[in-house]
C-alpha cells in the first residue's frame, strides 16, 4: 500500500512497506530507494514526517538486562556445559532464571543468594527431566552453603509454582556407583578388590530398595545410604578377602568422599539384615553378628519380601494376640516350650517379639527430652489463706478493714456457745 511522506531522491509519494526477512522497510515504488529501515522499532509508520522513536518510548526500556542478570545467565549456561547437559536443559534453566529474576524479592536479594539461584534453576531442570544430579554436587561446584542452597531452592519452587518430582534413586545409584574406581585393576587398587560393575550395581540396587522399604531412606540424604549399600554389596561378593576392609578405606580405594552419616546408615542396614537372618532356620543356629552376616547377604536378598514381612510387620499381630490372652493362660505351656526351645534362653524366658517397622526417628528417643508441664487443678473456688490475702492489699484503708474483720472473727470464735 502507498504510504505517507515523499521519497528523498525522486520526490514520489508512492512509498510501500517491503518486508525483508524479519525487518520491515519503507521503499519507494518508483525509484526503489529504501527510505527507512526498521519501521516497527525506530519509526511511527502512520506519521508523515517519519520521526524516530525515542528510547524512553520504545520497548527497549522494559527489556533492559542488568549486569547482575547478565552475569547470572552466563553462569547458568557455563554450569550446564560443565555438567554436559543437553541444549534443551540449558534453555529451560535460562528461562527459569529469567522468571525468577522478575520477582522483586530475588532482585533485591544479597549476592550469595543470587549466586545460589544459578544452581537452583539447573537442579530444577535436571529433576524435571529425571537427570541424576544431587544438591550436594551443585553446592560443590558453586562453593555454596548447603543450607542457603536448600532454602533458596524451596523458595524458587514456590515462587514459580513448579512441579518438581523427587529424585530417582535407581538413576542416582547407577551414576554414583559408576564413579567408583573399583572396576579395573590399578596400582592403587589390588586385584582382590576389583569387582564386576554389573554385579555390584545389581546388588547395590537391591540393598537400596531394602533400605527404602525399612524407612532408612525417608527424609535423609541419599548419598550416605548409597555409599553404605555399595560397601556392603562389594564386601558380600567376595567376603573372604574384603571383610577386613573398613568403610573409610573402601572410600579411599574407590576415590570418593566418605559422607559423614554413612557409618550410621551402615549400622542401620546391618541391624536390618540381622533381623532378617533370625527368620531363616539355617542362619539362626550360626549366631550371626554384624560382621558375619555380610557373608549371607545374597541369601537374605533372595527372600527379601518374606523376611521383611516376618521380621517386622508380623510383630504387630503378635503383640495384639498376646494382649488378648488372659493373664494366667498358657503359663505352663509357655514354660514347657521355653525349656525345650533351641535358642538357649533361660528358664521362664520367652523369645522376644519381632520389632515394629518404624522410622529410626521414632525408635530412638530425642536428644533433649521436653519436660512435661505440671497438671494444674486450680478451679478458682479454693480458699485464700491469710498470708496470701496480704499480697492483694494495696491501701491503708484496706489494711485496717482487714484487721478489724480478722479481730471480729477471732472474737466470735472465742465466745462459748450457749448451753
Swiss-Prot record:
Residue numbers spanned by region Interaction with target DNA: 108-114
Region called Required for the formation of a ternary complex with DNA and TBP, residue ranges: 357-363
Chain segments carrying region Disordered: 314-351
Chief localization: nucleus
Phosphoserine modifications at: 353
Pfam families referenced in this protein's UniProt entry, alphabetically: BRF2-like_C_cyclin_rpt, Zn_Ribbon_TF
GO biological process entries: cellular response to oxidative stress; regulation of transcription by RNA polymerase III; transcription preinitiation complex assembly
Ranges of compositional bias, category Basic and acidic residues: 314-326
Record's comment on post-translational modification: In response to oxidative stress, Cys-361 is reversibly oxidized to cysteine sulfenic acid. Oxidation of Cys-361 impairs formation of a ternary complex with TBP and DNA and down-regulates expression of target genes in response to oxidative stress.
Keywords per UniProt: Activator, Metal-binding, Nucleus, Oxidation, Phosphoprotein, Repeat, Stress response, Transcription, Transcription regulation, Zinc, Zinc-finger
Region feature Required for interaction with TBP and formation of a ternary complex with DNA and TBP, mapped onto this chain: 365-419
Entry's induction text: Down-regulated by epigallocatechin gallate (EGCG) treatment.
Protein purpose: General activator of RNA polymerase III transcription. Factor exclusively required for RNA polymerase III transcription of genes with promoter elements upstream of the initiation sites. Contributes to the regulation of gene expression; functions as activator in the absence of oxidative stress. Down-regulates expression of target genes in response to oxidative stress. Overexpression protects cells against apoptosis in response to oxidative stress.
Family indicated by similarity: Belongs to the TFIIB family.
Name of this protein: Transcription factor IIIB 50 kDa subunit
Gene: BRF2
